[in-house]
From Swiss-Prot:
Its EC number is 2.7.11.22, 2.7.11.23. Component of the srb8-11 complex, a regulatory module of the Mediator complex. Residues 390-427 are annotated as: Disordered. Component of the srb8-11 complex. The srb8-11 complex is a regulatory module of the Mediator complex which is itself involved in regulation of basal and activated RNA polymerase II-dependent transcription. The srb8-11 complex may be involved in the transcriptional repression of a subset of genes regulated by Mediator. It may inhibit the association of the Mediator complex with RNA polymerase II to form the holoenzyme complex. The srb8-11 complex phosphorylates the C-terminal domain (CTD) of the largest subunit of RNA polymerase II. This is Serine/threonine-protein kinase ssn3. The gene is ssn3.
Length: 427
């Protein structure tokens, strides 16, 4: 799928194998002595976060198409901007996106340095999975079609296989970071937490003690594992698969925050949410669990509950069958339902033991994809509905402005802010 591999020296330092397919088009990468407004017309403001702001733009002067421009904010003290450098997350994202090139990974067009501000220019995507899930939670709307779920999952795993083959862990897969173009192509986005795992100088834990949004965090991370693998991304894919079917997070726990000493607490509530569906993990099904730093906390959690409160065996199949029934999927294996093959894939993605968890390569060869007929590269194919466009506002479209808005997400349409969906914006 990826062709012959060869070593290359990338911008993070060190030699890493890379596929011959991963070649950036001419013009991508770092650009200096260029002004953003000379190359792009700023349409409006999309969203902001701890990293800075994102704007929608249209190319001009030879730059064709729509783009999303990510502006990284400098550190501020009062009214004086302190140029102390970029965050580790921003540097990683720029370095990795400059090297990666795959149809299911977001495409970086260029990086512009202007007046000590960094701008990453990406292809524009009209939707993301969080937006699509919100759309289907509204009254009078139905579940996401089974064929659409299958196409989304296949494309997601295809992009993830590319990352893992090139020694990249994403480490923050969640619906909001899975982008969807207007033509139904899936793009894995937001590589700010991504890391190379080919002979790292330090353990992955030492650089970032907390990775992956809590609802999608693998059990080995919750158990304090210092050395983790691509399996953490596959657990997150399992959580996303379940959420596409049920329209709500399968393990919706509450995160315990770090204390003043920056000590990572045991995520007791999140682990309980997993146990309620997956059963209590034991050394018989996960031998390595006894050596995990938080194993004593897990034992304490189990003993604090009344006997029989936690199932010793998994209730995932019961959850799955209830999900199919409640969302109108057929109970029989057919093109209109995930069926038994869907459950088998889900159970292998949500395997407690990371050494037994299915890989991206194995998942792509699973009967769920093999037995259901051709898979479209357009996840919207056959879907008669219309998803609203990403909301773009004019309130803050001055890309050269020094002021920074508060953290918010403006990418969701108005109707997705109603009812149950409102809570999701606080994750």
């Amino acid at each position: 799928m990826f062709g012959r591999s060869f070593p290359f020296y990338n911008s993070l330092g060190g030699f890493y194998p890379q596929s011959l397919d991963a070649r950036k088009p001419p013009g991508s990468g770092y650009t200096s002595k260029v002004r953003v407004r000379d190359r792009y017309h700023i349409v409006g403001f999309i969203s902001s976060g701890t990293y800075g702001r994102v704007y929608k733009a249209i190319g001009k002067n030879g730059q064709k198409g729509e783009f999303a421009i990510k502006k990284f904010k400098p550190d501020k003290e009062g009214e004086i901007i302190q140029y102390t450098g970029l965050s580790q997350s921003a540097i990683r994202e720029m370095a990795l996106c400059s090297e990666l090139d795959h149809p299911n990974v977001v495409q970086l067009a260029e990086i512009i340095l202007e007046d000590k501000c960094i701008f990453m220019v990406f292809e524009y995507t009209e939707h993301d999975l969080l937006q699509i899930i919100h759309h289907h939670t509204q009254p009078q709307r139905h579940a996401i079609p089974a064929l659409m779920v299958r196409s989304i999952l296949f494309q997601l795993l295809n992009g993830l296989l590319y990352l893992h083959t090139n020694w990249v862990l994403h480490r923050d897969l969640k619906p909001a970071n899975i982008l969807v173009t207007s033509s139904g192509a899936i793009r894995i986005g937001d590589l700010g937490l991504a890391r190379l795992f080919y002979k790292p100088l330090n353990s992955l834990f030492s650089g970032d003690k907390v990775v992956v949004t809590i609802w999608y965090r693998a059990p080995e991370l919750l158990m304090g594992s210092r050395h983790y693998t691509p399996a953490v991304d596959l657990w997150a894919v399992g959580c996303i698969f379940a959420e596409l079917l049920s329209l709500r997070p399968i393990f919706k726990g509450e995160e315990a925050k770090m204390d003043s000493k920056k000590t990572v607490p045991f995520q007791r509530n999140q682990m309980m949410k997993i146990i309620e569906i997956m059963g209590l993990p034991t050394k018989e099904i996960w031998p390595g669990i006894v050596s995990m730093p938080e194993y004593s906390q897990l034992q304490s959690l189990a003993m604090s509950r009344a006997p029989g409160h936690f199932n010793r065996s998994s209730n995932l199949e019961g959850w799955y069958q209830s999900c199919l029934k409640n969302n109108g999927y057929s109970a029989n294996s057919s093109a209109g339902t995930p069926g038994a093959d869907g459950f088998d894939l889900l159970s292998r993605l949500l395997e407690y033991d990371p050494t037994k968890r299915i890989t991206a390569q194995e998942a792509l060869e699973h009967p769920y994809f093999k037995n259901g007929g051709p898979i479209s590269a357009n996840c919207f194919e056959g879907f008669e509905g219309k998803y609203p466009h990403r909301r773009v506002t004019q309130d803050d479209n001055d890309i050269r402005s020094g002021s920074l808005p508060g953290t918010k997400r403006s990418g969701l349409p108005d109707d997705s802010l109603l009812g149950r969906a409102t809570k999701r914006l606080k994750e």
